[in-house]
Amino acid sequence: MGAYKYMQELWRKKQSNVMRFLLRVRCWQYRQLSSLHRAPRPTRPDKARRLGYKAKQGYVIYRIRVRRGGRKRPVPKGATYGKPVHHGVNQIKFARSLQSVAEERAGRHCGGLRVLNSYWVGEDSTYKFFEVILIDTFHKAIRRNPDTQWITKAVHKHREMRGLTSAGKKSRGLGKGHKFHLTIGGSRRAAWKRRNTLQLHRYR
């Protein structure tokens, strides 16, 4: 096995004494830093490389801190108006994962970069920490490489805002296999609409 395989196995055993100590110390370190800061290198090089990261010019890593828990509806003094069934304020569950929220915040902060992917690096009782891989699409090393030219196209601007990253697609229910049958036809709404529309074709 190569070195990255050993690292992967280490990260799979998060309850081991070594990893518990490491994650605890790192969470303390991350809490002292700002909620969005640039990391000099990936904390998990094996995971970052599997997601497309290369240790060369044009690739940037940002570490994001996201507060855990549900989403409180932003209404003044809980005044939601309307019928009591829609009066919920506190027990609201956000439709997207905290990982996709972290990607969105990184994309907003670094508007000139493109979000490639992200991965989990730690959590405590209050926060979750993710590292986001961003790409500078105007760097010659990116534009001249056939493997990364696809992300330089304008259609990939702010892909994290439109649910086109891996974490975003998971929240949209998109994927392959029997687990994703609710989105056959493009999206949950398209699948529901097709299954709930009566079509009476003309007999010819």
UniProtKB/Swiss-Prot annotation:
PANTHER family: LARGE RIBOSOMAL SUBUNIT PROTEIN EL15, RIBOSOMAL PROTEIN L15. Belongs to the eukaryotic ribosomal protein eL15 family. InterPro entries: Rbsml_eL15_core_dom_sf (IPR024794), Ribosomal_eL15 (IPR000439), Ribosomal_eL15_CS (IPR020925), Ribosomal_uL23/eL15/eS24_sf (IPR012678). GO terms for biological process: cytoplasmic translation. It comes from Hypophthalmichthys nobilis (Bighead carp). This is Large ribosomal subunit protein eL15. It is found in: Cytoplasm. SUPFAM superfamilies: Ribosomal proteins S24e, L23 and L15e. Component of the large ribosomal subunit. The ribosome is a large ribonucleoprotein complex responsible for the synthesis of proteins in the cell. Keywords: Cytoplasm, Ribonucleoprotein, Ribosomal protein. Gene3D superfamilies: Ribosomal protein l15e (3.40.1120.10). Component of the large ribosomal subunit. One of its GO terms (molecular function) is RNA binding. GO terms for cellular component: cytosolic large ribosomal subunit.
